[in-house]
C-alpha cells in the first residue's frame, strides 16, 4: 500500500473525508494535517482544519488526548506554533523513529544502531519493522522485528521480539528508547524490563510537557527479545487544560488585563468559559480611561477553543 493515502480511501461514505483535501493518512498509525496558511500575529500560531474520524486520538508530539464522538467524526481547528504541525496518532499506535547514535553520521542511510519507538495507550496493537540493506529486491534479504502492545487485567506489556530473517542487514546490537506518550506519570513507579527473560536495568524518565514516559535500554543484541511491563497499566494522562490555556495566552499579542480576565474565567469555569471569552472585547473602556480597555482577538479565542474542547 502507499505510505501516504487520502482519508476517503478508508472513509468513503463520510463527506468530511473528501472536504479536507490537505489531510492524509501517513502509514498505518498516523493522521497528518499540514498547515498551509500564514500564522495569525495575535496568537503567534497558525492553524489547520482537521477532521478526526470517530474514536480517540493523541497529538503525536505532545500526547494531548482528543475525543471524536460522532459517527461522522469531528472537525476542529488545530493551532500550532512555528516548529509543529498537527499530527494525530490512533490509540495503541507504535511508531519507530531513527535516533542518531554516538559516532554515526547524521546523514547515514545505514540501518540505525539507535531507535526510538513512540507508543500510545488506549488499545492493543502490533507493528512489524522491516529493514533491508538498501539494495535488496527479494524478501529473503529483509529483517523483521515485531513489536506489540498488550493488556491483561490492570497490567500492560510492550514487547520487542528478536529480529528474524536476514539479520546481517541490521546492527548486531541496538540502543532502544521506548517513549510511551500521553500517559499518566504514575506508570513510571511500576515499570520492569527484561531482555530474554532476564531482569534489565533501564533508564526511566518522565517528561511532563509531552506527557511521556521514556524507557531506555542500551546495547541490546538484536537477537534478544525485550519486554517492558507495567504492573499498574498505562493510564491516559489528565488533560492539562489550564497549563495549555496559559501557554496560549502567554504568547498572545493582546492587552495584559484581558489575558488575566480570560485565564481567570478558564480556571473557574473550564470549557464553560468559552462563550464568555468574546464578551471581553471592549475597546471603549470606562469613560475616557483607556487603561480599562479590553481586546480579545478572535484567533486567540479560536486557539483556546481547541484546548478547551479536546474532550
Positions of PLM-derived features:
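Catalytic core of carbohydrate-active enzymes
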Residues: 1-190
Amino acid at each position: 500500500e502507499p505510505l501516504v493515502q487520502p482519508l476517503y480511501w478508508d472513509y468513503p461514505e463520510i463527506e468530511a473525508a473528501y472536504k479536507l483535501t490537505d489531510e492524509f493518512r501517513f502509514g498505518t498509525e498516523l493522521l497528518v494535517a499540514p498547515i498551509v496558511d500564514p500564522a495569525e500575529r495575535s496568537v503567534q500560531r497558525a492553524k489547520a482544519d482537521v477532521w478526526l474520524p470517530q474514536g480517540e486520538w493523541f497529538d503525536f508530539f505532545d500526547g494531548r488526548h482528543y475525543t471524536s464522538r460522532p459517527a461522522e467524526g469531528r472537525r476542529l481547528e488545530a493551532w500550532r506554533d512555528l516548529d509543529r504541525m498537527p499530527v494525530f496518532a490512533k490509540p495503541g499506535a507504535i511508531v519507530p523513529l531513527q535516533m542518531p547514535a554516538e559516532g554515526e553520521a547524521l546523514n547515514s542511510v545505514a540501518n540505525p544502531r539507535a531507535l526510538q519507538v513512540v507508543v500510545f495507550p488506549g488499545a492493543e496493537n502490533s507493528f512489524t519493522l522491516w529493514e533491508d540493506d538498501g539494495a535488496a529486491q527479494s524478501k529473503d534479504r529483509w529483517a523483521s522485528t515485531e513489536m506489540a502492545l498488550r493488556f491483561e487485567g490492570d497490567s500492560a506489556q510492550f514487547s520487542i521480539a528478536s529480529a528474524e530473517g536476514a539479520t546481517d542487514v541490521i546492527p548486531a546490537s541496538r540502543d532502544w528508547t521506548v517513549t510511551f506518550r500521553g500517559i499518566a506519570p504514575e506508570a513510571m513507579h511500576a515499570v520492569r524490563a527484561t531482555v530474554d527473560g532476564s531482569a534489565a536495568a533501564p533508564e526511566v524518565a518522565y517528561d511532563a510537557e509531552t506527557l511521556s514516559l521514556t524507557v531506555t535500554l542500551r546495547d541490546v543484541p538484536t537477537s534478544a527479545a525485550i519486554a517492558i511491563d507495567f504492573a499498574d497499566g498505562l493510564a491516559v494522562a489528565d488533560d492539562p487544560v489550564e497549563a495549555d490555556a496559559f501557554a496560549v495566552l502567554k504568547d498572545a499579542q493582546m492587552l495584559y488585563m484581558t489575558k488575566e480576565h480570560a485565564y481567570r474565567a478558564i480556571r473557574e469555569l473550564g470549557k464553560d468559559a468559552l462563550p464568555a471569552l468574546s464578551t471581553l472585547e471592549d475597546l471603549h473602556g470606562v469613560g475616557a480611561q483607556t487603561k480599562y480597555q479590553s481586546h480579545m482577538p478572535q484567533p486567540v479565542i479560536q486557539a483556546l477553543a481547541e484546548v478547551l474542547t479536546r474532550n
